[in-house]
Amino acid sequence: PKSWLFHPIPIWHCRHGERFDQPYLEARYEKYGIPSPFTGKQSLDLYLTLKPLKSLLKLSAMKQPCMEEFLGIKDRIYDNGKECIKLYKDFLKKRDAFTADEILGHNLEDVLGLGRIFDMLGYLCIYDGDYEVTYSEFDGDNLILKLKLPCTLPQEFSNGNTDFYLTGKDEEINLIIKTTDGKLKQYYADYKDYYYLPEEDTVIPKSLGSGIDRKHRKAATRNTCYTWFTCSDAFLSSPVQQKQYLTYTLSCLIGTLECV
């Protein structure tokens, strides 16, 4: 690629480019004394950015065709990337137009497909806490919540396990979280600052737990760094408290989903 192709765009978009394409191209630019078009520009690697969605959306792999298939895009006609590597080796020997068209056709589909999967960034709002809680209810066993997103999801989805279940469609997320005797787990991000107390099934800050016998405490992990609170009327009537609860806890719950 020539530098002028990147000039109008301050951020360049790619899929797996930060680990593969960019280092490869940078090495070639240096070898042939060509100015790098990446200098001074930020990058958005969709593979790395969207990777957390794999289990949530039940994606079989984070390959671009898999993401396109999830979005309902099924108009690819050229060979996949693995086949194109073989085709390229054949092309170096034969230099025939048909093989060249196959390779270029695949590359064109990949480039155009980047724009199509760009909409999947909207699902990250669920992880980032970028939503509003619009409804809450406790049915005696489960906490039921509705969340409003700032964007429209490109495809509806559903997923869950024995602890929770969620669905997403358009701009709304429906969430059901199972309670234990009317109590919920509040997870914390800074788990390295806590001790987990197995006998009490809760955590305590290390600053307060240093005096507890080592037999009764462990270093907390992402999965064990939580305390319990009652799903009270005060909690159910406070969207602010509900948002505080969900901001990190929802990501932890999603992290318990099994990959396909």
Spell out what each predicted region is:
Residues 1-260:
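DEDD superfamily 3′-5′ metal-dependent exonuclease/proofreading module
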